[in-house]
């Protein structure tokens, strides 16, 4: 029998030894690295970074290569009428060439000498026409639109970064809760097993006394009923441990059936001091800064909306080459040229469209301000409640520790009095039950204190990864 016991003990020892023991910090880090919401927030930040670089390019000129090729079967005849061309001779007095004509009395001229110019008829064919070149566009003044859009993209990037911190703090709190569930469940197993050991020892004494005629069968049954209850408690506690570990595995990105354990010493910090809910602490929260950035975003949106109804000035230009068209079989166009153009647009009258759009943007800005004030009040309330809960949890730990100490002393005194017959079995069982409850309350209070501290740090903006 002893050999079988040692074999079972060895197997259990090996099993527990193979479990990976995780610290609270390791669980937090794994949860942040594997959480999908954190990953989404990081992708959003990456996207916002690309948006900043995208809108920055609007300050720079844009170059494009343009090309087009047209082939047309269209053609037409070009007729140039004939006539007389005057002949010029050099006039020494005038120092220039003058036409050889005679002025009539009615003011008309008669050509003294002329050359005949016969009429011309030529074929113009569209044939193949090619156009190609390099064009550029450079905004000079867009009413502040380019600057406003760029500023909005930078604000969006800041908000994305703050959202990562916010999501990480939420994940840390959720991980702390899952971690604490494992510690609580493990400690409850210890409570139940310690209570069982106490009952087992009592049962041996009562059963021995019954065999010697010093106790009744009813006394034995009373102890057995308590033993059955504690067996069920142990089973429930072990089930709670398994479920709590699976829940923790879910948060830290491990398979649900992974063999893990936690370091319970993280929750045994004896240095507990009360806190004061200073409203200025909410300034540390990423949510607070996000609200301020949203206000700035709404302010820039007003500028962006107004820019649609302000003057726009832009510079365009480039170099274009054209080759095409034939006149009597010879290429008519075959050259290139540089060009530049300044465009100016000034909205004049849109039936109040711009005014209404700007007012809508300003209304959104006021809504953002109201939202900020409302959420600031909510964060202050959350901080106050978290501080109260933490202070109450500190007081509760002190009380349960004292109650446990008193319950331990009470069960010792009860055992002595029971052994000498000054106390009934029912009274002694009640003392043991009070000790078990005090032990469980102390475990619950310590776990609750750890959670209240974690939630307070989040509410105060101090729980950052």
Spans of model-derived segments:
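Bacterial Sec-pathway N-terminal export signals of envelope proteins
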Residues: 19-77, 256-299, 348, 464-465
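Hydrophobic h-region of N-terminal signal peptides that target proteins for export
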Residues: 9-18
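Small/polar, glycine/serine/threonine/aspartate-rich low-complexity segments that form flexible
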Residues: 66-135, 263-272, 317-346
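Acidic, low-complexity, intrinsically disordered peripheral segments
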Residues: 64, 71-90, 441-465
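Periplasmic alpha-helical coiled-coil/stalk elements that build and connect Gram-negative outer-membrane
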Residues: 50, 162-282, 389, 393, ...
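Amphipathic alpha-helical coiled-coil segments
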Residues: 40-55, 167, 171-190, 201, ...
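Amphipathic alpha-helical coiled-coil scaffold segments and their short linker/junction regions
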Residues: 28-34, 84-119, 254-317
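Small/polar (Gly/Ser/Thr/Ala-rich) solvent-exposed segments
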Residues: 39, 62-77, 120-127, 137-166, ...
